[in-house]
């Protein structure tokens, strides 16, 4: 599945389930839908992978009222899942929105984990940003377990989202101006 941009109104959990089911050959994978329900264009700052990869590059921008479709998977022949962070810059507001996911290889030791945050300035994803999102440190909100909704305001934006709890995970996130 190529990463794509679709109208935000067309994003559904079924769309994400179809994407994740289309990733073959691995048991740990994720499809993420990110709705930009603001009046701003979001500029991609990159993707950081702690483990795993994506078969496609992430979209350069997400226009107002559009949704990003992104997928990632564990790397072949490794005992690790897919764990990473992608970030988009909200130029008109000089803020960055980060989305972090973790779909572990070993559910005896770990569980799915995710987070979203809006921060001041232009902040590309890297190991420090990812670790702060994963651990709820460095001023980042505490991460969420699957099946727990995020519904809060950060830096003038309303964030809403959820993650499913299995090795074929989905995350659906909405960003709105507060």
Swiss-Prot record:
GO molecular function: channel activity
Residue ranges, annotated region (Trp-rich region): 101-117
Regulation: Inhibited by sphingomyelin.
Iron listed as a keyword: no
Name of one Pfam family that matches: Anemone_cytotox
Keyword rRNA-binding tagged: no
Domain of life: Eukaryota
Induction remark: Strongly up-regulated by abscisic acid, osmotic stress and drought, up-regulated by wounding, jasmonic acid or salicylic acid and not induced by salt, cold or auxins.
InterPro entries assigned: Actinoporin_PFT, Anemon_actinoporin-like, Cytolysin/lectin
GO cellular component labels: pore complex
Residues binding phosphocholine: 51, 83, 102, 104, 134
BP GO annotations: cytolysis in another organism; monoatomic cation transport; pore complex assembly
Keyword annotations from UniProtKB, A to Z: Cytolysis, Hemolysis, Stress response
Free-text comment on this protein's domains from its UniProt entry: The Trp-rich region is important for the binding to lipid membrane.
Its biological purpose: Actinoporin-related protein having hemolytic activity in vitro. Binds probably a phosphocholine derivative with the unique amido or hydroxyl groups found in sphingomyelin. Involved in drought tolerance.
UniProt similarity note: Belongs to the actinoporin family. Plant subfamily.
Protein name (database record): Bryoporin
């Amino acid at each position: 599945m190529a990463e794509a941009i679709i109208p935000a109104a067309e994003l559904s959990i079924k769309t994400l389930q179809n994407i994740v089911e289309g990733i073959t050959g691995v048991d740990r994978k994720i499809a993420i839908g990110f709705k930009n329900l603001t009046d701003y264009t979001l500029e991609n700052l990159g993707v950081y992978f702690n483990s795993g990869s994506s078969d496609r590059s992430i979209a350069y921008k997400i226009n107002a009222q559009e949704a990003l479709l992104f997928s990632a998977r564990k790397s072949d022949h490794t005992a690790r899942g897919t764990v990473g962070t992608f970030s988009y810059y909200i130029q008109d507001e000089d803020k960055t929105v980060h989305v972090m996911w973790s779909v572990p290889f070993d559910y005896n030791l770990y569980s799915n984990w995710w987070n979203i945050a809006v921060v001041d300035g232009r902040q590309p994803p890297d190991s420090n940003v990812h670790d702060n999102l994963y651990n709820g440190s460095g001023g980042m909100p505490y991460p969420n377990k699957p099946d727990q909704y995020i519904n809060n305001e950060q830096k003038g934006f309303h964030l809403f989202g959820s993650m499913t709890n299995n090795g074929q995970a989905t995350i659906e996130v909405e960003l709105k101006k507060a």
